[in-house]
Structures are given as structure tokens and as C-alpha cells.
Amino acid sequence: MKKLQYIDRLTNQRVTESVCYEKTMTFLYSSKLGKRLSTLLSRSPILSRIYGWIQKRSWTRRKIPGFVKRNHINIKDFKKSLSEFSSFNDFFTRELLPEARPIAQGDNICVTPVDGAYLIYSNIAEFGEFVVKSKRFSLSKLLGDPRLVEKYASGSVVFARLALFDYHRFHFPVDCLPGPTRTINGYLFSVHPMALKDNFNIFCENKRTLTELKTEAFGDVLYLEVGALNVGSIIQTYKPGEKYSKGDEKGFFEIGGSTVIVLFQPGSVQFDADLLKNSRMGLETRCLMGQSLGRSLRE
């Protein structure tokens, strides 16, 4: 399997990503039998529910110390001690201390909404023409709403991929007034790069939720959470119609990998130069929640 590399934003160094369950992932996405099996698993919600149920059993706590050690997770960031987690899923949906993720300041600054690996595209229209294994990415399929497609078709898009070892709570990238969340039911294909290299439209096929954010600094912003392999549960903790500050929690994913997508209208945001540079090279940038994502272009 080709090693996945990304840029660590804190050090600006190229790093090889540690893949959880690497042998299993290689089998599922590099062999004919594995691909057939992964498709079966992704299309079966009952298997996802069973997996989720298992990870909520108390005996799964035994996996936590080894998982933390293998993935070099900083336990000093946690609100709870390792012994306080009731299950592996409880650990997976962990909360962090506020000081663990400082929020970039400035009314005209938007921030990264999750811990994860980021790809940034300033022009969705150009990205929409990208062909991945002869399959075009479709904004229309992703959003399922002609009004939203027209609104964001010439705007910008942020993809943030969360690995299994990441902190899995998602946050608002801007000061905003969020509307209600709309759910589009779908499958639970993996969003790991090994799966995306064959079909970027996985984002358009997976279960996902959409929330429109009203903002003063950036105009309207569209926020999507995309489920992935074994992630059937996207939990919203915010209240529609209440004002939130950037960095405030919006919700969390239950166990599995997942993705957050944020869309901006045309002429509303200038993304940070390092994120754009890395994305143009085809490299994800691994960021922590609350870091600067870009600045407003609106007066």
C-alpha cells in the first residue's frame, strides 16, 4: 500500500500518516474481494449498528490505553482521565479541555472546525470538473437541493477528513446563527484516501447532514457532516436559531472515520496561503480545531 503523506501544520513538515488497522484497510481497498466486502459492509446499516453497539460495551475500555499509545494521542488534552471512560465509544467521543484548542482571534477570521486533514479549493466550479477514476465530483448530488447548488456553485469548499485517532467533536468555524439540520440518508462508505482515489463521489453517496449558517462577516455558509464506515450516528448538540461563536461545539460523530465539508459563497473568503499551497500539491494539511482557516473578503 502506498504510504499516505500530509503536511503537519504545526511543524510544516511532511509526515507519513499512521493508518489504523492498516492490514485490514489494505485488504478492503487493494483487492477485488476486499472491495466487494467493503461495499457490502457500507451498504448494510444493521452491521454498522451492531459495530456501534459493541463499541459501547464496558469491556471495550480495555482497548483504550493501547490505542492511545499506538497513535501518540495527548491525554493531557482530555477532560476525563483514561480510567473514567465507560467504553471505547465514550473515549472516541471525548471532550477536550478548552485550553487544548485555542481559537484564532479576529472578527474577520474563520477557523478550522475539527481536528483533521484538510483539502481546500477556492473555486468549486473548477473542482467540479475534477475527474477521479472517470467519475466527476457532483455538487448537485452532494447537496440534493438546486437552490443550494446555485448559491454555492462558484464558491469555495473545505474538506476536513477525520481519522479514527482524531478528536471527533465538530465546531462552528464562524460566529453564526445556525438553522435546522437536514439529513440526507445514504450509505457508509469509508472516506479514507484509499477509498476516495477510486471514487470521490463517496461524499455524495454517504449519509450526511446539512446546516445553513447565517453570518455577518462571511455571508451564508453551508456546513455538512458526512458519515463514513461504521459512522451511522451524527449527533447535533447545538440549538437551531441560537447565536454561536466560532469554536463553539456543534456536535460529534460516534465511532468511525468521518468528514466535515464547509462551503462559502463566491468572494467571501481568502483561505490561508499554506493550506492552499499544500492542497494544490495534492497534500492534505493536518490541523487542529480552532486554527486560522482564512479571512473574510466582505466589507
Swiss-Prot record:
Subcellular location: Cell membrane
Broad EC category: lyase
One of the protein's GO biological processes: phosphatidylethanolamine biosynthetic process
E.C. numbers: 4.1.1.65
Catalysed reactions listed for this entry: a 1,2-diacyl-sn-glycero-3-phospho-L-serine + H(+) = a 1,2-diacyl-sn-glycero-3-phosphoethanolamine + CO2
GO molecular function annotations of the record: phosphatidylserine decarboxylase activity
Pathway the protein takes part in: Phospholipid metabolism; phosphatidylethanolamine biosynthesis; phosphatidylethanolamine from CDP-diacylglycerol: step 2/2
Post-translational modification: Is synthesized initially as an inactive proenzyme. Formation of the active enzyme involves a self-maturation process in which the active site pyruvoyl group is generated from an internal serine residue via an autocatalytic post-translational modification. Two non-identical subunits are generated from the proenzyme in this reaction, and the pyruvate is formed at the N-terminus of the alpha chain, which is derived from the carboxyl end of the proenzyme.
Pfam families: PS_Dcarbxylase
Site entry (Cleavage (non-hydrolytic)), positions: 257-258
Cofactor(s) required for function per UniProt: pyruvate
InterPro entries in alphabetical order: PS_Dcarbxylase, PSD-B, PSD_type2_pro
Pyruvic acid (Ser): modified positions: 258
Disulphide connectivity of cysteines: none
Membrane topology: Peripheral membrane protein
Record-annotated active site: 115 (charge relay system), 171 (charge relay system), 258 (charge relay system), 258 (schiff-base intermediate with substrate)
PANTHER family membership: PHOSPHATIDYLSERINE DECARBOXYLASE, PHOSPHATIDYLSERINE DECARBOXYLASE PROENZYME 2
Subunit structure: Heterodimer of a large membrane-associated beta subunit and a small pyruvoyl-containing alpha subunit.
Function: Catalyzes the formation of phosphatidylethanolamine (PtdEtn) from phosphatidylserine (PtdSer).
HAMAP family: PS_decarb_PSD_B_type2
Name of protein: Phosphatidylserine decarboxylase proenzyme
